[in-house]
From Swiss-Prot:
Stated family: Belongs to the ATPase B chain family.
Transmembrane portions of the chain: 2-22
InterPro entries on file: Alt_ATP_synth_F0_bsu, ATP_synth_b/b'su_bac/chlpt, ATP_synthase_B_chain
Protein name as it appears in the record: ATP synthase subunit b 1
């Protein structure tokens, strides 16, 4: 059998042309369509992955924000709780301090009132005692007691220090008025002579001396000239005693007044 090479070549060319035509007009559009579809699917998958990733990021961001919000809320609640606790403690401390201050004031006021009442009663008692003593001495005063007081007065003049004598001389020697000797009762002549002699010996014989009675004196003697006075009497002793007792009571009260302040300072320090 003879091979028709022309026919074979023609068939081969036809086959190649057919393959090229199929590839160009049939397979290529199909392949392009498949590629386009694959590309579209890939793009959609990529877009879906992107959206999923974005959603995941948003979810994580939301969770982070929620966590931060929870932390902030917890911190804020803790802060508010601490502030409320501190404020409660401050208010309680303020109330306690006010209560302590009020208690101290009431205690001090009560103590002061007690001291005031005690001082008032003590003062009244002292006044009554001294008044009774003064009245008793006034009732007991007599001419004989006055004579004894005159003897004591003369002895006191003789016992004066030089500086005191000089002061009395400067006081009474310059006076041109009569020197008056006051007594509660009329003195016997002996005591008058005794006092006159003592005063002349101290002030000089030129001093004019007169004697007078003064009911306000309690067993004592007082010398008066030109507004200048010296004297010695039981009343003077009572006055001095009263002053000393009052000074002692004032000092005692001052110490008691300092005691509440000291107690208050010690309580605050503790």
């Amino acid at each position: 059998m003879l091979i028709d090479w022309f026919t074979v070549i023609a068939q081969l060319i036809n086959f190649l042309v057919l393959v090229w035509l199929l590839k160009h007009f049939l397979y290529r559009p199909i392949l392009n369509t498949i590629d386009a579809r694959e590309k579209r699917i890939a793009d959609e998958l990529a877009d879906a992955d992107s959206k999923i990733a974005e959603a995941e990021q948003q979810r994580e961001a939301f969770q982070q924000k929620n966590a931060e919000f929870d932390q902030q809320r917890t911190a804020q609640m803790n802060k508010v709780g601490e502030e409320a606790k501190a404020e409660r403690t401050r208010l309680l401390e303020e109330v306690r301090q006010e209560s302590d201050a009020l208690r101290s004031k009431l205690k001090l006021a009560l103590k002061n009132e007690q001291l005031s009442l005690k001082d008032s009663l003590s003062q009244r008692a002292r006044e009554e005692v001294f008044a009774i003593v003064r009245k008793a001495l006034s009732d007991l005063a007599s001419t004989s007691l006055e004579a004894s007081m005159a003897d004591v007065f003369v002895k006191r003049l003789d016992a004066l220090a030089d500086a005191e004598k000089t002061s009395l001389q400067a006081t009474f020697q310059e006076s041109t008025e009569v020197l008056i000797v006051h007594t509660a009762f009329d003195l016997p002549k002996k005591q008058i002579t005794q006092i006159t002699k003592a005063l002349h010996g101290l002030l000089g014989d030129g001093v004019v001396i007169e004697f007078a009675t003064d009911a306000n004196l309690i067993s004592g003697i007082e010398i008066d000239s030109h507004g200048q006075k010296i004297g010695w009497s039981i009343a003077d002793y009572l006055t001095t005693l009263t002053k000393r007792v009052n000074d002692v009571m004032l000092s005692h009260n001052a110490v008691q007044d300092e005691s509440p302040e000291l107690e208050k300072s010690q309580e605050q320090a503790s």
